[in-house]
Curated annotation (Swiss-Prot):
It is found in: Secreted. Expressed by the venom gland. It comes from Manica rubida (European giant red ant). Residues 24-83 form a propeptide. This is Delta-myrmicitoxin-Mri1a. Residues 1-23 form the signal peptide. GO terms for molecular function: sodium channel regulator activity; toxin activity. Belongs to the formicidae venom clade 1 family. Vertebrate selective toxin that causes moderate pain by targeting tetrodotoxin (TTX)-sensitive sodium channels in peripheral sensory neurons. Shows moderate and low activities towards hNav1.6/SCN8A (EC(50)=3.3 uM) and hNav1.7/SCN9A (EC(50)>10 uM), respectively. At both hNav1.6/SCN8A and hNav1.7/SCN9A, causes a small sustained current, a reduction in peak current amplitude, and a hyperpolarising shift in the voltage dependence of activation. The small sustained current remains after repolarisation at Nav1.7/SCN9A, but not at Nav1.6/SCN8A. Negative results: does not show activity at hNav1.8/SCN10A and hNav1.9/SCN11A when tested at 1 uM.
């Protein structure tokens, strides 16, 4: 059974138009919304509290990276007899590597 060309084109047009509605500028949040809120906006956090939170987040990220590296090293050491396990260990670390690259 052959699909009519106009039906194929109609499906593509509908799919593209539905995806474009999500990218419409009116769907984006207003960057000036906080300035317009004025007194209703929350007070900014103190710089010292922000620095402490940032340092804690960096320490947690470093600890997680060290834990992943240690787990990968252990998995590779145990997997010498089974050739598929190093590949599995590598594939399981890809999300962590991507997170570390994209989030600094």
């Amino acid at each position: 059974m052959e699909v009519p060309k106009f039906l194929f084109i109609a499906v593509i047009v509908i799919a593209l138009s539905s995806s474009l509605t999500w990218a419409h500028p009116m769907a984006a949040p207003d960057p000036n919304a906080e300035a317009a809120a004025g007194a209703w906006a929350e007070p900014a956090a103190e710089p010292a509290a922000e620095a402490v939170a940032e340092a804690a987040a960096e320490a947690a990220a470093e600890a997680a990276a060290e834990a992943v590296a240690e787990a990968v090293a252990e998995a590779l050491a145990e997997a010498e007899s089974e050739p598929g396990l190093p590949l599995l260990a590598l594939l399981m670390t890809l999300p962590f590597i991507q997170h570390a690259i994209t989030n600094g």
